[in-house]
Amino acid sequence: MVVSKQEAISFSVTSLGWVGAIVSCVLPVWRVTFPDDETDPDATIWEGLWHICQVRENRWIQCTLYDTRILVAQDIKVSRVFMVICTIGTWLGLLLCVLGDWRINCFMNFTIEENLLKVAGGMFLSVGLLMLVPLSWVTHNIIHGFFNPLLGFSKKVQMGSSLSLAWTSSLLLLLGGILLCVNIPVCRDFPRCIETPSARPSGANNDTLDV
């Protein structure tokens, strides 16, 4: 299997972005609400895509799944769908990238392998852009609420580490897609493309004619 340096970097960067997207999707730290002195002064609230957790000062954490009794924000519901689509789409892009690298050899149809890498790069770019939609929505709501003068400090929500990780993952996916799209190898870059089984020495035909 022939893999260029740019392809290896793109694959590594995109793999990191994919792992980061999965981790951010699982960990329930998208939004953090600090303790309210009037209700529960010891508990910090973590909100994720699937869980909501109470974290107390003694580091005791209690997490529960969202159910009908807990009102789930609309931006969180949409983020669930987008993040699942993005993680699956990135996995498919990585699979195409591996297949494209594995099948690049000059005794096969090089155009097919080149197209596989183009599709993989396009998928990485699309997934990275698609991930920005829920991230921007959630971040906008957090910032808007944080600077709302009608809310006290204890009611204000801040960005969690999972949301920051999701932003980083989205940028890594975009970077990996760009690197792959602009550095797709062409057949002439590989020595085996020149040396095909049908190649003959230049003097072979002359010897035949002399006989």
UniProtKB/Swiss-Prot annotation:
Organism this protein belongs to: Mus musculus (Mouse)
Record GO cellular component, one term: bicellular tight junction
Stretches of the chain found on the membrane's Cytoplasmic side: 1-8, 102-118, 187-211
InterPro entries: Claudin (IPR006187), Claudin_CS (IPR017974), PMP22/EMP/MP20/Claudin (IPR004031)
Major site of localization recorded for this protein: other
Disulfide-bond pairs as recorded: none
Entry protein name: Claudin-13
Gene Ontology molecular function, alphabetical: structural molecule activity
